[in-house]
């Protein structure tokens, strides 16, 4: 099905251009991830494999952190800024609430505010992360660790983050899929060969002949787990809850009844990306505070709460995923606007009063769907982390669930967008033919 869809897509010039443009932008991003920041010994980071937040940062940055490239921050600051702006729209700042109701004009203002906030966050985060890794590497990361060097590295990483954000926006506007998700998707896909190599070396290299059976069983269970995650994720991402809709006024040729489809997991994979981004950056800051010798109780507590290799950290990560799932579900689908749009189009849900009654019905339904979505996302992301801690597995396995979730969800969304565009073109072409 995928290859047939791709073949059909490449037959249409406009669709082909969009696909090739997306691939081109991803290639530009991948080239940028190979350019190491000047004055930094990136090989030192290979000695920090056991630092959990480094692996999380690498995931969110699209695998650009491993060699401390100019794109090392990736879209992480933009993601954090987006969360801040969306929170400010929830009756926290009147100006942001007002912009949220101004349609396209307000959206442009909110996007501008997001960019300014992400610029500040990127600069602070870049200096914090550089100082963290320099301290953890026993002062070997930065060649000349002075104020001027840190400011220069901060400026380079901030500029790189802004470029990556711009590349993501180009994909969203002119290519296919969500730009932020596609950037992270590309980074994860590029790291798959390295993940496979790491798992192979741990399972088979320098293993005694008597332990070979255990290694084969381990790899077999791992492959089975991957297949289960792929099937389960594909099923949930494509599952829909259909709300029956009826119309009071039937236009000529219009159906008397229809349905409103809602995804079983309306938030998609965004809550996991949000939670990963929120967890990784503060963990780096607290790590450097601790490494500098400031080991107050609250610092140790904060480290435990944000590190995904501690029970408290895993619980916090799961809680963040749950909270962001509920939050982003209501960002994606506004019950008030849905009720208003149904009423304007002369549609209603059988057994539910239009207006306020429909809004309350949608709110209850979205809470139930968000509950299902949070359990699903939590299961896929947390179980591999627990398996790592219980069986002494690598971080490649621990973050494998999150990586697979992002790959599959982004792939499905891209295919749906492509399929929808082809269907729309076919429908428009048919209408043009019938009117001639």
Regions found by a protein language model. Give the residues of each.
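N-terminal cationic and glycine-rich segments that engage phosphates or anionic surfaces
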Residues: 1-98, 105-436
């Amino acid at each position: 099905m995928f290859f047939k869809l791709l073949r059909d897509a490449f037959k249409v010039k406009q669709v082909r251009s969009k696909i090739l443009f997306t691939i081109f932008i991803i290639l530009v991003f991948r080239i940028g991830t190979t350019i190491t920041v000047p004055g930094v010994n990136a090989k030192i980071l290979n000695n920090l494999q056991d630092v959990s937040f480094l692996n999380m940062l690498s995931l969110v940055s699209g695998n650009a952190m491993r060699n401390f490239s100019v794109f090392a921050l990736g879209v992480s600051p933009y993601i954090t800024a987006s969360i801040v702006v969306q929170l400010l729209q929830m009756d926290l700042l009147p100006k942001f609430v007002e912009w949220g109701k101004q349609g396209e004009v307000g959206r442009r203002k909110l996007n501008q505010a997001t960019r300014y906030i992400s610029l500040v966050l990127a600069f602070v985060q870049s200096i914090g992360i550089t100082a963290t890794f320099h301290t953890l590497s026993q002062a070997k990361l930065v060649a000349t660790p002075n104020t001027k060097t840190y400011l220069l590295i901060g400026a380079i990483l901030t500029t790189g983050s802004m470029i990556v954000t711009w590349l993501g926006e180009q994909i969203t506007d002119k290519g296919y899929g969500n730009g932020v998700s596609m950037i992270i998707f590309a980074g994860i896909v590029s790291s798959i060969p390295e993940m496979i190599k790491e798992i192979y070396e741990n399972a088979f290299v320098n293993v005694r002949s008597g332990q070979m059976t255990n290694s084969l069983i381990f790899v077999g269970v791992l492959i089975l787990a991957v297949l289960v995650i792929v099937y389960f994720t594909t099923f949930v991402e494509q599952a829909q809850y259909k709300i029956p809709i009826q119309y009071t006024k039937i236009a000529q040729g219009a159906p008397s009844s229809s349905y409103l489809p809602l995804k079983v997991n309306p938030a998609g994979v965004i809550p996991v990306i949000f939670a990963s981004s929120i967890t990784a950056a503060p963990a780096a800051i607290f790590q450097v505070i601790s490494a500098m010798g400031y080991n107050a109780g609250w610092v140790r507590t904060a480290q435990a709460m944000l590190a995904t290799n501690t029970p408290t950290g895993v619980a916090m990560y799961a809680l963040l995923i749950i909270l962001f799932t509920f939050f982003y579900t209501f960002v994606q689908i506004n019950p008030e606007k849905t009720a208003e749009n149904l009423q304007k189009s002369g549609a209603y849900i059988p057994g539910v009063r239009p207006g306020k009654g429909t809004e309350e019905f949608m709110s209850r339904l979205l809470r139930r769907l968000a509950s299902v979505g949070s359990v699903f996302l939590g299961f896929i992301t947390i179980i591999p982390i627990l398996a790592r801690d219980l069986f002494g597995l690598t971080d490649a396995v621990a973050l494998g669930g999150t990586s697979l979730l992002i790959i599959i969800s982004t792939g499905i969304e891209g295919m749906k967008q492509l399929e929808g565009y082809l269907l729309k073109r076919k429908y428009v072409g048919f209408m043009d033919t019938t009117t001639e």
